[in-house]
């Protein structure tokens, strides 16, 4: 039909098709286009798993599938044309362990202006449409009605055949209330009066449509037997938008901490997704925890988010210290609120590895700076 509006011309033709997964047999049509229309270059987008799963067989050797993340904090600042202080370029957060105290002090002073913009990023969300709307109330309304509702009510029925949409919405609302924490499946089933297989199916579908991330516990065998999953929403602004919190999120230390943890996980996941990094959480025998653990081959990297007003010291991260000692991790990270507390902490033990013995240390990184650098290095890695 589009040919009726666009007459054929010489040279390369470019086709851009959105929400392709809603078209029946889209992969067959795309295969024919690639095989027989050599002068066409086609880009298709979709927001659901069928774009990947249904196109794998037909697409081998014909097209590449790329995962596009929502806006990082770095991209958000540039999209809104917000002046950014001159910060050092980092290829990895690991480079912070080579900094001098003077470098930390300088960047702390320069980065202070980013805190308010980071808080607004948490309220608006990481979608371009909501980022560009002037009113935060309108941005959250858009996120709630135009993005979340469409996925729940349109994609779930059209693509996955979900018939009990109301029950699905109740499960999602429950996750908005309890996001960033361990999922108590028994409590969820009891409170919503739903059966466990139904809830498991809903949660898997929510993960398939990229509305949530699900983390399994760190470890193997008996360590994770019957352990609970940890659930993050896909965007820090989803929960305050759905729960109609508005800007009061910033006045609720607990909810704000969850939003920051959600934002940080989104950034670290997007940064290392292409490298097939495994993500989990850790919980020790004395209820000591590590929020996020990244596994890269034989290397484990723990992250703990402590977004609170008071200064965070070694006494506040006993779980992180225990994990580093027992799992032989020489480096860990605390993601904090205190922009002036940007520094390196030394743990009271050394770590022995194949390459020798090294001191165990933790980098205290303010959340706005951590998300800024992760977002920037994600783009830098795509540029090669």
Predicted regions and their residues:
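Structural recognition of the conserved hydrophobic beta-strand(s) that form the central parallel beta-sheet
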Residues: 16, 41-47, 67
């Amino acid at each position: 039909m589009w040919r009726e509006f666009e007459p054929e011309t010489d040279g390369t033709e470019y086709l851009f098709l959105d929400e392709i997964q809603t078209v029946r047999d889209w992969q067959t049509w795309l295969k024919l286009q690639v095989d027989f229309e050599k002068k066409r270059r086609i880009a298709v987008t979709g927001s659901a798993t069928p774009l990947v799963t249904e196109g794998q067989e037909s697409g081998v050797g014909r097209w590449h599938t790329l995962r596009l993340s929502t806006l990082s904090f770095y991209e958000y600042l540039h999209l809104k044309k917000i002046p950014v202080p001159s910060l050092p370029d980092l290829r990895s957060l690991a480079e912070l362990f080579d900094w001098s105290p003077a470098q930390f002090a300088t960047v702390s002073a320069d980065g202070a202006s980013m805190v308010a913009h980071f808080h607004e990023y948490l309220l608006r969300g990481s979608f371009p449409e909501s980022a560009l709307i002037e009113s935060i109330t309108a941005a959250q309304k858009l996120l709630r009605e135009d993005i979340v509702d469409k996925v729940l009510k349109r994609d779930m029925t059209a693509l996955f055949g979900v018939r009990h949409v109301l029950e699905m919405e109740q499960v999602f609302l429950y996750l908005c209330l309890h996001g960033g924490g361990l999922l108590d499946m028994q409590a969820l089933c009891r409170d919503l009066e739903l059966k466990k297989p139904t809830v498991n199916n809903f949660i898997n579908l929510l993960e398939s449509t990229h509305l949530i991330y699900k983390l399994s516990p760190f470890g193997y065998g008996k360590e994770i037997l019957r352990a609970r999953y940890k659930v993050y929403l896909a965007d820090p602004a989803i929960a305050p938008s759905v729960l109609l919190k508005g800007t009061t999120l910033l006045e609720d230390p607990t909810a704000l901490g969850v939003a920051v943890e959600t934002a940080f996980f989104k950034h670290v996941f997007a940064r290392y997704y292409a490298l097939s990094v495994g993500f989990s959480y850790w919980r020790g025998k004395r209820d000591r925890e590590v929020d996020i653990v990244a596994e890269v081959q034989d290397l484990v990297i723990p992250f703990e988010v402590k977004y609170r007003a008071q200064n965070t010291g070694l006494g506040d991260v006993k779980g992180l210290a225990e994990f580093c000692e027992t799992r032989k991790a020489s480096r860990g990270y605390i993601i904090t609120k205190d922009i002036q507390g940007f520094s390196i902490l030394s743990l009271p033990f050394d770590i022995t590895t194949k390459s020798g013995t090294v001191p165990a240390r933790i980098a205290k990184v303010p959340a706005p700076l951590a998300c800024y650098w992760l977002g920037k290095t994600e783009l830098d890695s795509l540029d090669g």
